[in-house]
Amino acid sequence: AEGLVPTGLSVDGIDYRKSAGNPLPTITDPRTLYLNARQGMASSDFSGVTILLPKEAGLTELAEQINGAWQKDCSLFFSVEEVPQEEFDKRLAADSYTIALAPIRAEGGSVYQMLQQFTAEGGGLTGWSAPIYSQRLAESAQQTGSARCALLADCERQLLEGCAVVPLLGQNRRLLLADGITGLVFDPFTPVLDLTDA
């Protein structure tokens, strides 16, 4: 992912990703940062850590890849817990998780609504809150054009720098089907449409 907000979204006719630039924090050596942070911690401090996923969201393979990388680079392995979407939403809302892989949506293509999910008014997706974040987001609703893009970009950077979220991948391809169509298999990452059983 190039940022939390995927490519292809615009704000007042301006390409948001192009205007906002790269919001990802610069971490020159993530492994050294991790090793420094882990000093004084025992491996047992990480026991019981699980990666929470919504069932049937297509995130199982991604969780396995992440777990493999953590095991290889950091000698850590976490169990994966897949739960129905309703339970997943409840646990996110109750802050009852250690690590969660949560799809973040830009409903209607709105950067503002996407970022609002991280405020109390927008549902508090991660339980993270920062008054300056909410203030800047509210200010962005009063602005237009490049001024609005700049405020939204500040919000996106704040989320990423505060490690409230870490974007793993972005998807802006989808397939819409008419009612009654069954048996199609769509892989948005390739993209491939399999009509074998249709």
Which residues are covered by each model-predicted region?
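Short, solvent-exposed loop/beta-turn-alpha elements that line the ligand-binding surface or hinge
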Residues: S10-D29, R91-D95, Q116-E139, G170-A198
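Extracytoplasmic/secreted proteins, especially bacterial periplasmic and envelope-associated proteins
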Residues: D29-N36, G58-Q65, A69, E87, ...
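Append "and occasionally in soluble cytosolic enzymes with long acidic Gly/Pro-rich linkers
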Residues: A1-G68, K72
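Bilobed periplasmic-binding protein-like "clamshell/Venus-flytrap" ligand-binding domains
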Residues: E2, N36-K55, P103, Q143-D179
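Hydrophobic, well-ordered secondary-structure elements that form the walls
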Residues: I51, W70, L92, T98, ...
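Solvent-exposed loop/turn segments at secondary-structure junctions
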Residues: L9-D12, E56-G58, R105-G109, R173-L175
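Extracytoplasmic/periplasmic, Sec-exported soluble proteins
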Residues: S19-T26, P54-L62, V80, P84, ...
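Periplasmic binding protein-like
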Residues: Q71-G122
